[in-house]
Amino acid sequence: MNKLTYIQEIVLKCINKYYEENGEAPTLSELCEMAGINTKSTIHWHLRNLQKKGYIRVIPKLKRGIRFINNN
């Protein structure tokens, strides 16, 4: 897997924390708030890059459609 940027690490940790606390993925709005990012387009950009790097899968048009990819 490719190395993560500092912000990508924060976004990934926020997703993981939300999963642990709630048993489901955060919405984009919740993720923006948790990561301290102002716009959904910026979150989309980071999610797209995390997906390209093989850390997550984003299911289009699904409200809580962020899934971790198991790469053991």
For the regions a protein language model found, what residue spans apply to each?
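Short, Lys/Arg-enriched anionic-surface-contact patches
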Residues: 1-10
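A short, conserved structural fragment
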Residues: 51-59
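Pre-recognition alpha-helix immediately N-terminal to the DNA-recognition helix
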Residues: 10-17
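A short alpha-helical element within helix-turn-helix/winged-helix DNA-binding domains
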Residues: 25-37
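Helix-turn-helix DNA-binding helix
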Residues: 42-43
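Short, cationic-aromatic polyanion-contact patches
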Residues: 5, 22, 61-72
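Short helix-capping/hinge SLiMs at alpha-helix to coil transitions
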Residues: 17-23
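Alpha-helical DNA-recognition elements
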Residues: 17, 48-49
